[in-house]
Regions:
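Nucleotide-activated donor-binding/catalytic signature segment of Leloir-type glycosyltransferases, i.e.
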Residues: 268-277, 282-308
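Carbohydrate-associated surface elements
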Residues: 198, 215-218
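Conserved donor-binding/catalytic core segment of Leloir-type glycosyltransferases
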Residues: 230-248, 254, 410
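Nucleotide-sugar-dependent
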Residues: 11-12, 248-251, 305-310, 317-336, ...
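Membrane-proximal helix-turn-helix segments that form the acceptor-binding/catalytic region
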Residues: 20, 101, 138-141, 145-149, ...
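N-terminal subdomain of nucleotide-sugar transferases
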Residues: 1-65, 191, 212, 416-419, ...
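Acidic anion/phosphate-binding donor-loop and adjacent secondary structure
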Residues: 58-60, 219-234
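A conserved catalytic-core segment of Leloir-type glycosyltransferases
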Residues: 35-112
Length: 426
């Protein structure tokens, strides 16, 4: 069996890396994951080389006699209402400092430690290929050095775009400098992979390379065939995961729901909206402002397995997309989890023509709402169906199309590229 060294910090790697690695042996590849943080699950089916490193942000907070577990702005006394404003003085000052100190990212101190471990591995064993996955982008810098030193083919996997990222935190000067680093680093990769066709096209424009591929995120196939839960008796709408203030807009959804309840199109005794994730102050303010405290509840964080159960028992799932035309190529990971639950999805936000809208059409799994009026229209239709049938029907969801997005298929696509690179190297 051929061996692939996967360089990815599992604290940031989302389910993509551990989920894909799990299936590599079925396609003739043994994965060895080099990471700075341990995987969440203890029963991983692949080998892990753990290389702990000092956290640069924590170190700086300690030097400044600050609590390493709390944000800079909170400890500086910046009001909550100002913390998410990108152009506030405190935000710009902190961002400037971060941009200088944490270049190219907060994992910069991992590089030396990881290189030592990777070189030792290559001395002991025959490594046939390398995959690096970002963020953090430090993983690509490590992979580049190992690939060059040991003449090993290398795939650079970008779960988020590097300097083309729609959520890029730093200013024009830092972006200019970092884009030169991106071009210099990735031009030596044998292949570049990202998570959507639109992002692959963006990378092709920047890098002018023809070795760029798209492999979407997905879900563990076991989720698709998990035991189905009884649906809630109420018209339940469920959201799982964090809410990113300034990116996810809950205001239009709550306003639309409030309008329907006030006009008695929806009976408030029938409906419950459940948010499972970190407590969000702005969301709570919106709930109270719309007089929905008896309907909408924040339950806080729950274990991952419990969130899957809550998804499967819900009449309807809420997916918040970003109202930003620059994110048309972004698939929210939550969307794939929702698909595996086989429950209807209500997507709010977005500007249309994006990958999520196409995904909903392809799988017949959900309704896409661009604005408040569309949310009102879709919710009233779904509620009417619930009242007539006692549940929201999911029989039109295309399981075969959904199954195309499982992580076993993603692993197969990675190994096809790996085998091709090995063949080209002779």
């Amino acid at each position: 069996m051929k061996k692939v060294l996967i360089i990815a910090d599992l604290q940031h790697a989302s389910p993509r890396i551990p989920s894909v690695a799990k299936f590599f042996p079925e396609f003739g590849w043994e994965p060895i994951v080099l990471t700075g943080h341990p995987p969440e699950a203890e029963d991983q089916t692949f080998r892990v080389i753990l290389t702990p490193f000092p956290d640069s942000i924590v170190e700086w907070k300690k030097r400044l006699f600050m609590n390493p577990r709390e944000g800079f702005q909170k400890q500086l006394g910046v009001p909550f209402s100002m913390r998410e404003k990108k152009w506030s003085f405190s935000a710009m000052l902190i961002n400037l400092c971060r941009g200088i100190i944490l270049y190219p990212d907060a994992n910069k101190k991992w590089r030396r430690i990881a290189l030592e471990a990777a070189n030792e591995l290559c001395r002991r064993e025959d490594i046939d290929a390398i995959i690096s996955s970002s963020s953090p982008v430090t993983s690509h810098l490590i992979a580049q050095e190992i690939s060059k030193k040991w003449n090993i083919p290398w795939i650079a996997d970008l779960r988020d775009l590097w300097t083309q990222n729609h959520n890029y935190h730093y200013g024009h000067t830092r972006r200019f400098i970092e884009q030169r680093l991106e071009l210099k680093t990735l031009k030596t990769a044998d292949a570049i992979v990202t998570v959507s066709p639109l992002w692959a096209a963006d990378l092709e424009k920047l890098h002018r390379l023809n070795n760029i591929y798209s492999i979407t995120n997905g879900f563990d196939p076991d989720l698709l065939y998990a035991k189905k839960n009884d649906l809630t008796s109420k018209f339940s709408i469920t959201y799982t995961g964090p809410i990113y203030t300034g990116k996810h807009d809950t205001a239009e959804f709550l306003s639309a729901l409030s309008d329907l309840v006030t006009k008695e199109i929806i009976d408030r005794k029938d409906v419950e909206v459940r948010f499972y994730g970190p407590q969000d102050e702005l969301l709570q303010q919106q709930i109270e402002r719309n007089k929905l405290t008896d309907i909408v509840t924040q339950y806080g964080l729950i274990p991952r397995e419990s969130s899957f159960k809550k998804q499967r028992e819900s009449q309807l799932l809420l997916l918040l997309y970003w109202n930003d035309p620059e994110v048309k190529g972004w698939y929210p990971l939550k969307g794939f989890e929702y698909l595996a639950s086989q429950r209807p999805i209500l997507v709010t936000g977005g500007t249309g023509g994006d990958v999520v809208e196409k995904l909903m059409h392809q799988t017949k799994a959900g309704l896409y709402c661009r604005n408040r009026m569309e949310i009102i229209d879709r919710l009233s239709q779904l509620y009417l169906e619930y009242k007539e049938k006692g549940r929201i029907d999911n029989s039109k969801i295309d399981i075969n199309e959904i199954n195309k997005f499982n992580y076993k298929n993603a692993a197969n696509k990675f190994t096809v590229i790996l085998n091709d690179l090995i063949k080209k190297r002779g």
